[in-house]
């Protein structure tokens, strides 16, 4: 599903923009269906280009592909038109381009730029929370600060997704519902991974279970693996083993998840064998 760019207005006259430059992270569940979603600000009214030159420069910038090229174009556009209402769309596209390239650091940087322009952008909220949760480690000195940022962003995204997500005009009701469901799944996944890393295993199990249910039609190995870890810490070994097996099946060609899930499965199987010997 390819998303069209928003309808723009030049000097207050709406101008339809072709979908040729629209973006889609094809094949990537954790952002595949969303593409470059419109910001909440654009949902409220048609964004305006103040001149024909601005409108044409925006079109040229949006037609580029690749995270690096799109980011450079967005920076140049922002410098040339510091008050433009269109800049957020270029940074949003750069964010999704970097996501397609698995460049989480630059995707996060672009998400932060989007949020500075539109604090109610659900996709930027959940993508940034996802990257922040993935980055957390036990040695972080600012773990509590990072955890609170993730909580705030996920909570806000979940609060506004029904009203702030604006799909393209040709999106079907089913596509819009699927996009919103993906955002919710991402938010609960980020919350659960963060909670797992700070030792809130019950909270992690709760939120990762919601995320797993949200991705049931297309099981996500990463979510299932972290859910199994939370259940392991809660000594729910039967559930943990079932979910790590599901993670193995869903991992496909993702070698990192397969390796981690295989190690967790061996640990759980060893525990099960030890328990049977004791009995």
Locate the predicted segments by residue.
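N-terminal leader/linker segments that initiate helical-solenoid repeat arrays
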Residues: 23-89, 276
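Flexible helix-coil transition and linker loops at the boundaries of alpha-helical arrays
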Residues: 43-46, 78-88, 116-123, 139, ...
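Start-of-helix signal in alpha-solenoid helical-repeat scaffolds, especially tetratricopeptide repeats
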Residues: 51-54, 88, 122, 129, ...
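"A position-specific structural signal for the A-helix of alpha-solenoid helical repeats
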Residues: 59, 93, 127, 183-186, ...
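Single-residue signature of alpha-solenoid repeat helices
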Residues: 70-73, 107, 150, 204, ...
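Alpha-helical linker/edge segments of TPR/alpha-solenoid repeat scaffolds
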Residues: 101-106, 132-145, 181-197, 232-243, ...
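TPR/TPR-like (Sel1-like) alpha-helical repeat modules
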Residues: 145-162, 232-256, 262, 266
